[in-house]
Structures are given as C-alpha cells and as structure tokens.
Amino acid sequence: MKKTMLAFLVLLNTIGFAQKIKPVLPVPTKEHLAWHEKEFYLFIHFGPNTFTDKEWGDGKEDPTTFAPTQLDCNQWVRVAKLAGAKGIILTAKHHDGFSLWPSKYSAHTVRESKWLEGKGDVVRMLSDACKKGGLEMGVYISPWDRNHPDYGTPKYNDIYIATMKELLTGYGKFFELWWDGANGEGPNGKKQEYTFRRFEDSAFAYQPHLMIFSDIGPSIRWCGNERGIIGNTNWNLLDTAGFYRGHGGPPEDTLNQGNVNGKLWIPAEADVSIRPGWFYHAKEDNKVKSPNTLFNLFLKSVGNGGNLLLNVPPDRRGLFHETDSASLVGFAALREKAFKTNLFTGLKPLVKTTAGLPTLTYTFKKATKLNAVVLQELIEHGQRVKTFTIEAKESTTGNFVKIFDGTTIGRKKIATFDPITTSSIKITITDAKAEVLLKPSAAHDFGFEVKN
C-alpha cells in the first residue's frame, strides 16, 4: 500500500518523495532525459549528391560539382523553428567522403570546390545559424568513405578519429553524433574494419555529453526502418551483446520494439525523409509528404515514446524548397491545433488500485468529445508499464466500454481512437514491472481525422 500511495503522490505532482523511489533498472542518464524532451528535429542531407541527382555518391565526383547558388543556413533554421523542430543534424560527410567543411584530413571537401572560392564551410555556417536561432545541432559523419585512399587500412581508423576531433572540438557543442550502418568498399576495393569502441571513447572524450546514434547505440538506437515508425510496443531498453552495427545488427522487430528486460537504456529514434529520397531531386517536388502525413508519423514515433528525425534536403540553391517549407509549417499548425487544449485540465482523477495496479477515472463536467489520451511515465525511475486500457462511459447504459488497448507507455504514449463523446474516461494499468509512476495525463480533441 505504501508503494502505491507513493506512486500517486508523484502522479499528482507532489514529487518531494521521488528520491525514495526504488528505480527499475536500467534508467536514463540526464543526457538521455534531455534528448527525450527534444521529440522532433530535422535531418539535412546535402552535398555533391544534391547536384548529381544521386542518393549514394561514389567518391569520384569532381568537387566543383558542389555549387549552391544561394546557400542560406539561416533559412534552414528559420523554417526548422517554424516547424517546431528542436535541432538540426547535418550530413557533414556522407559515404562519398565529401566533407562540408575544409577538413585537413581529406582532399575531397568544400575547399576543393569553387563555391565561395573554396573558402566556404557549411558546418560553420549552420553552427552559427543554430546558435543565433536557438537550435541545437548534431552531425552525421559517415565512417564509410568511398574517396579516401587510406580507407580499408588500419590507418583510416586514426584518420576517422582525427576527423571527428576536427568537428567535435572546433564547432561548439553538438547534441547528437549519427553513425550510419553502411560499410562498403573504398576506392581501393577494400572494406574497413572499424574500431568503433575507439570511435566511441574518442567522441565522448571530445564531448562527454554527446548522444551517439547507431543500430545499437551506445546512446540511441535505430528503429529498424526508414519509414519513421516505432513499434506500438516500445521499450527504451536493449541488449546489444552479440550484435554489431550494420550487418549483424539486431533484427528489425527488436530494434522497433526494444527488449522488455534489456540491460541498457538505448531509446529508439525514427528517421524518415519528407521526400522519397534523402537528397534533393527536382522530380520529387510533387511528392513531398503532406502535413497530415507528417502528423501521423509524429503519432507513430513520438506518440510511441521515441523521437522523430525528419529529413528535409536543401535544393541546388542551398535552400529548403518552398513545397517542403509549406508542409513543415502546416505540420506545426496541426500539432498546435491537436494538442492546444488539455480536456483533463482542472480535473482530479479518482484513483483506485487492484493488486497494486492503478485505475484513474476522469469525470468531465459535461459530455465531452475527444479522440486522444496522452500518458507519460516518470522514466527517470525506469520504464515500468507493460499494458494498459482506456475506457469511455456510454451515455445510454452508463457502462464503460474499451476504446484502446495499449502496451508500453514510456516517455510518452499518444493513444488515438475514433472520436467519442463521453462524460468519463477510465485509464487502467493492467500490468507493470513495479509501482506505476505517471505524470499527469492529457486528453484532446484534435478536430481533424487521424488515420491509425
């Protein structure tokens, strides 16, 4: 009984006793907690592929191919802020090996282009724009390099670490370092044996609070697909023993759902592009995802407890295309409309327990229309909830009928259902690892159709 009461004291925002709560391991670090709060940020794929109309360059492209005419990182930041994104991750070096900064460890960089007479630095420009605009920045640095002559030799691992050091010590604080799982051949036909443990140790030495993304972390995991969808069941926990990055990584369903008893806190990030491709292609100008499609992806990623990394590739001018920008602004407007009003505001739930599991009943002052309930755990003490249900009271019979069957909650669960009008909502936790610690719940009427 004491544990149950403690749980509900936390639920009702009286958190003075939280330090006495026994955690359910593993628990997130403070860096994880800050990352979880970001929810949504942009990915930017930009480089020679933008101008060659390719997705994967071969490293043989002439550096002068990179020739943006109006590059404006401040425009990227302005649009990102209008979209409600909390940061931007830039492909500083993709698989072609072309560096968007004048790296001294490569001869395939913006320095060798004619853009700004070889004196340009996209990473610097974006870093400055993000600082000015109040956004955080991250970098994608591809380990695979199809241009570097030392790729496929032990020396290349040292070069890669030196390359990371250039970026991680020369451009300010980054919130995330992104590692792609691709590992193909270099210009000499050789594949590289990456020393990822050294890479990790070096990156953390340069920026101790950095979050590192890859198939298996160490900080953040891939969600197992590039469709922007995280599993309805989503544990922030993962077992990585016996798995590798790229080929040899965990199966898709494991990446998508995590491990219920995983030993490490490695939450899922959903990456998806606003267009069919990752780089800009003019032929895709009429295939940009609509605001409604983006909103549904938000529900399937952030709404399942992960983060959404949405790719928006600049065009050959070096600007976000007008169609992409309009869709992003429309996406933000839908989120604002959907979550603006919390229908539970001012209501105190009636709390009952059965076998230590809570039921929360919210009673409205009058019949109320809604189509979503938002639940959140206090994940700093571990992820606990395994299953839950949501019921609504019928006006004719007075009985409660089930409107949602859920599994995990984690950092956030946005449970959506067909619009209903009811006088009362009942939330029941039906299974959990330990005492349930929830933040105050929310209910919403989006005011538009949601496709589940």
Cite the ranges covered by each PLM segment.
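Bacterial Sec-dependent N-terminal signal peptides
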Residues: 1-20
